[in-house]
Amino acid sequence: MTTTAASGKRLALVDCNNFFCSCERVFDPSLIGVPVVVLSNNDGCIISRSEEAKALGIPMGAPLHQQQEVIRRHGVRVFSSNYTLYGDMSARVMSILRDAVPAIEVYSIDEAFLELPPAFEEENARELRGKILQWTGIPVCIGIARTKLLAKFANRHAKKNKQMTGGVFDFSTYWDPESLMVDAPCDALWGVAKNTARDLSKIGIRTVLEFQHADPTAVRRSLGVVGERLHRELNGISCLELEEMPPPRKGVMASRSFGSPIEKIEDLEEALANHVARASAKVRRFGLLATHLEIFLQTNRFRKEDPQYHPSIGMTLPTPNASTSELIATARELLQSIYRPGYRYKKIGVMLAHLVSEEEYQPSLFTAPVKGKIDIDKIVDEINRRLGDPKNPLVTRASMGTANSGTKWRMKAERHSPNYTTNWNELPVVTG
């Protein structure tokens, strides 16, 4: 179901501030006011920074090893990414938003577009921001406008000027909107990448205001239909619909780099089984079935001294499937066909693709029955959702190993915070 922001309607973009760092701070007050960074998979690069860390000049995406001196000198607190915690905190924020407005599009783990009711004023947005902070501990900024593009731009202004805006800015009622556009570069706009900005500069468009006033024909000639749509959005004409339900997925991938290089096929099989289990659970959650399965292996491209090998292989499944056990068996057969000894493998992954709706699929009398196995898997999914830890599910298959096995292939997460909200054994303890 989609909702178009028709004339007269307004949208809001709610964006959680420095989301991963904010989640860590909710349960550890000692982090408030000190620089905090969160790392990517395998503790490789910095993917979230508190305002204090940004002030130290720590760049987004910087490899951790390049920032060790700054971290040591300024006492920066460093955390491995805890996606279990972040996903749960995101769900709590989105639940509050759903109760506040007629329609919501969850755009990412830390962003959502809202369709606002007619009587929704800037003061209501401030109350909503306060409620989210009080109920979850997560600070957000809210930008309000007539279109998605302008709501994003309004949110940018709210965030960059928090002392003046208080984290909320309504572009649709601002008395001098052009003053915000006159010095803003085109790549400050949502959907305008660096190369798009370069194309615009070739036709004399360098600022957001110049883009807004540009000749639509020239924009379309330079950037095509996508550029024309952005231009219309910038002029308050809604072209991008609010998607209350995400479009059907074309595929689900699960892959991770290993904590240490892997050479034995037994370790690769265990890692692959875990990835297939995660991907198939996600496919089932969306009520879908996979008709194609593909796996790939990679050595470390950056270790030039190591022999390189990056094979992949796929196959169309005999029948659409979401059974973990059957998909693991198929994936292991494919792995056997591409595995070569003598290589130091860095990554393995699986893609479940060409997805079809479980409700629409009519199994042939001549295909192997899979519905019973999928139904059992769904029961396991529910048990793991209620009682397990997403990183270490309560119910697994023998081929997936245990939490204590696979120490080589499991990701590095040496600075991992507890799963405060999803694991009974890791609940925060309050002492008097």
What residue ranges belong to the model's regions?
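Solvent-exposed residues in well-ordered beta-strands and their adjoining turns
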Residues: E115-P117, Q298, P318, A353
